[in-house]
Amino acid sequence: PMTEAERTDFIRGIRSQTDKLDFLFQALVKTSRLETGVIQLDKKLGRLFDTVAQAMSGIVYAAEKKGIAVSVDCPEDLTVFHDSKWTSEALFNLLDNAVKYTPAGGKIAVSVVLWEMYVEIKVTDTGKGISESNQAAIFRRFYREEEVHEQQGVGIGLYLAREIVTRQGGYIKVVSEPG
């Protein structure tokens, strides 16, 4: 028979694995629906600040837990045509990666700048960086760098982010240097 402590650890492990499976399932469903056109992006004029805030709310706890300082520079009154739900999903995926790969005590910054022809949303962090040879690959479905297999993930978040941004007429890229 199991002790109470063993039972608690066992249940905690089951919950953790269930959460991972749920995350994978949800990511695959979202990707599939987006790719097959089941979900149509619904671009409307809306405040980008609210979309950024929604994405940020999903990573605040994990960032605090690692002691990562998070800052946002986004004009509150900036309105643009975008699908706020899916844009928030794309931004969350970028931020989630930033939290995963930024060491404890690091920094993550989100800045939003209105240019003449487009709006730039930039996520910067003090993470380990991505080698130039891997930069194009990180947006492929299921791609994961060899060195990051200790981190939780399935390699779908950045692919989904790229799909969402591209389907709204946007462009996503990475600028990084290892270290």
Residue positions per predicted region:
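Short helix N-cap motif at coil->helix boundaries in the Bergerat
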Residues: L48, G129-R140
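A conserved beta-strand-to-alpha-helix junction within the catalytic ATP-binding
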Residues: D42-S57, S71, V113
